[in-house]
Amino acid sequence: MKQKVVNIGDIKVANDLPFVLFGGMNVLESRDLAMRICEHYVTVTQKLGIPYVFKASFDKANRSSIHSYRGPGLEEGMKIFQELKQTFGVKVITDVHEASQVQPVADVVDVIQLPAFLARQTDLVEAMAKTGAVINVKKPQFVSPGQMGNIVDKFHEGGNDKVILCDRGANFGYDNLVVDMLGFSVMKKVSGNSPVIFDVTHALQCRDPFGAASGGRRGQVTELARAGMAVGLAGLFLESHPDPANAKCDGPSALPLAKLEQFLTQIKAIDDLVKSFDELDTEN
């Protein structure tokens, strides 16, 4: 079955092409740390031959506590992204939370992300669609894979068909997430075979029911990523940190930066193997 291709400059994103890594840090903590992390990702992905897009948030607007670190903000964040692009020649993805942020972000980055908690907000979707930029839609934890087609339709109605879908798990009772491996193919089907990627980092979140910060299961990142990529996906969404214990956001789910090359070597091997198989139709 023909898969839709979304182009991010010279990077082609599709379910049957070699996977694209959307990787970086959760939130911009400083200019120097962003440069360090991006440089390491660029070095490793070039060595392994993996198409790469840098990711980070300039503002974590949905933190559980008002006292939690949010990021440098829009203006400073765009300056850092511009420097990363100029220094390393990378494409950049970041998320927006308000319609007023959309155009200033679209002027700098290559992919605009629609956060999971906001994925059904029509005004925000319409503002994002109008930019003509590539869009990454995070599947809300409370929305079934089959309902994602409705969100894609909103973008199409807004004149934008450059849509990537991203799964980050579903609510499983209180304060826990699970990933439905069968949901990936459902998302492909209802979106006209749009590229589907897997946010393994946020799928590892496991909240303290009485706390103000998310916990995580970093020790299981490799097995969960291997399982997801074995389905045959367009890309992997990954966050790393040189010192996860002291990261300002979601450290418990972040891959230690020093383990990146070993981790990606395994993921690439699985992706290469799965995509070497002929398509097998078991419905007929």
Swiss-Prot record:
**Catalytic reactions of this protein:** D-arabinose 5-phosphate + phosphoenolpyruvate + H2O = 3-deoxy-alpha-D-manno-2-octulosonate-8-phosphate + phosphate
Q: In which compartments does the protein localize?
A: Cytoplasm
Q: According to the UniProt record, what class of enzyme is this?
A: transferase
> Does Cytoplasm count among this protein's keywords?
yes
- Tell me a GO biological process for this protein: keto-3-deoxy-D-manno-octulosonic acid biosynthetic process
Q: What Pfam families does this protein map onto?
A: DAHP_synth_1
* Cellular component annotations (GO), alphabetically ordered: cytoplasm
Write the Enzyme Commission number(s) for this entry.
2.5.1.55
Q: What keywords are assigned to this protein?
A: Cytoplasm, Lipopolysaccharide biosynthesis, Transferase
* GO MF annotations in UniProt: 3-deoxy-8-phosphooctulonate synthase activity
Q: What is the name attached to this protein's record?
A: 2-dehydro-3-deoxyphosphooctonate aldolase
